């Protein structure tokens, strides 16, 4: 199994590349890649071609540019030719406990995504290599909504236990306001 940081988003609501925003004095991309490396030694970055050359992880260019997270996940599967743990670059509080929980509960025959408090996180999951051709078909038919793909492919939703302190793990940073709130609450 390989691990991939999804960093190809437009970051339009943030107004700057989220992957490069500093979090605890490190770019978010590097922060997430380092966490992934604690659970899997084969870590890659999926995103815009050449955008992250300064980082010490191999890069995966999008096979189908501008196709959102689905395009990044497909590109990762095609590059790695293996089951792939994916994590977005904008979830700074994700940790090895959450990732180990996902790994311990995953079914190798289908897509596995984490669910927390009845919210599904399609970019935080394990995608088996055997779904690559199906993902390609969705992309070629311009069906890019991950929720539709997950439903069509009967993805397993792995419910992470809800406790008062675990909500933060699933926080996404999408806007400058999100960043300010998390900076002050961290």
Predicted feature descriptions by range:
Residues 177:
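A broadly conserved detector of short glycine/acidic/proline-rich loop/turn motifs that flank catalytic sites
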Residues 171:
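Dinucleotide-binding Rossmann-like beta1-alpha1 core, especially the glycine-rich loop
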Residues 1-146, 151-168, 180-184:
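Nucleotide and nucleotide-moiety/phosphate-recognizing core
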């Amino acid at each position: 199994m390989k691990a991939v940081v999804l960093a190809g988003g437009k970051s339009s609501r943030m107004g700057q590349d989220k992957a490069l925003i500093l979090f605890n004095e490190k770019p978010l991309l590097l922060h997430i890649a380092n966490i992934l490396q604690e659970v899997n030694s084969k870590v890659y970055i999926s995103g815009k071609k050449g955008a992250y050359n300064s980082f010490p992880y191999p890069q995966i260019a999008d096979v189908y540019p501008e196709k959102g997270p689905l395009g990044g996940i497909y590109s990762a599967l095609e590059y790695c030719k293996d089951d792939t743990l994916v994590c977005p670059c904008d979830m700074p509080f994700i940790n090895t406990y959450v990732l180990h929980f996902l790994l311990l509960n995953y079914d190798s025959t289908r897509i596995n995504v984490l669910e927390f408090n009845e919210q599904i996180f399609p970019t935080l999951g394990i995608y088996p290599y055997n779904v690559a051709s199906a993902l390609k078909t969705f992309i070629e038919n311009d069906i890019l909504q991950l929720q539709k793909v997950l439903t069509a492919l009967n993805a397993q939703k792995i419910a992470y236990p809800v406790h008062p302190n675990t909500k933060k793990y699933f926080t996404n940073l999408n806007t400058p306001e999100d960043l300010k709130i998390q900076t002050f609450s961290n």
